[in-house]
Amino acid sequence: MWLTACSLIVTRAAHLAGPRNRGKAVGQVMLGLSVANVLGVPAAAWLGETFGWRSAFAIVVVIGIATVVALIRVLPTLTGMKTTDPLTELGALKRSQVWFTLVIGTVGFGGMFAFYTYLNSALTTDTRLSVSVVPFALMLYGLGMVTGNFVGGYVADRSVAVAILGGLTATALSLGAFAVLAENAWAALILTYLVALTGSMMLPALQTRLMDVAADAQTLAAALNHSALNIANAAGALLGGVVVSAGYGYLAPSVVGVMLAVAGIAVTVVALATARHQPVGS
């Protein structure tokens, strides 16, 4: 249900913003998700510890109801959007550029998730940070995601291709630098922020590209983007676990992330080259 709601929100926000501001609109929606992670997770943990685990779920219900009421009251009537149906939406699965974009997201973000899954262990084992400092590092990661969505939206409005390729390249460089410099505490903290920033700046661009290449099937395409990110989460954690289990240490997932980001660049280049020889919506 959450994926369905989010895909609807993204497509409606992009429509309201207009062609020149779609990236910023999508980025602002994704920005909300990042802020929810930064503030919601620790808040829920505090509520659970203080008032019991049921209190966190109760707050979610209250916030959800308040959000629905707010949408009913302030969301303008949407005009000019094409109506669609399930068969039309499923047509997105026939378009090669939709699949290319989903693969870019899966592979590119896989490296970011490989890094994040083992970040706690890397900071305490290799950087030798105190356990009490790790929450601050995770907060930096969350702030990086917030900044990345904000920056990525502006870049996507100017060039979706630049936002994707630039984000993947910067992510590869940041992950590589972390693998080399993580023994220095200041470098590790700064790079933790940069990995999150560079990775997250791709999100608005990928979502915008999916809406472009999906033609009349934008809602399903938007939902599939979140599915691709969930696959990236699982695959990144799995690949990171493989290299850690093989004895390469907790910095090895960052190297895996570099490889996946480079693979994402390769897929992006192929997708862009192929798109030049295909009709719109193929």
Identify the residue ranges that each predicted region occupies.
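Cytoplasmic helix-loop-helix junction between adjacent transmembrane helices
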Residues: M1-G32
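A membrane-interface helix-boundary motif in multi-pass transporters
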Residues: E49-V61, V242-A261
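C-terminal membrane-cytosol helix-exit motif in multi-pass small-molecule transporters
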Residues: V61-M81, V267-A271
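Juxtamembrane intracellular "pre-TM" segments in multi-pass secondary transporters
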Residues: V74-I104
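Extracytoplasmic gate region of multi-pass secondary transporters
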Residues: W99-L138
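Helix-to-loop junctions at the C-terminal end of transmembrane segments
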Residues: G148-V160, V244
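C-terminal transmembrane helical hairpin of 12-TM major facilitator-type secondary transporters
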Residues: V162-L206
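A late C-terminal transmembrane helix in Major Facilitator Superfamily
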Residues: V213-G249, G257
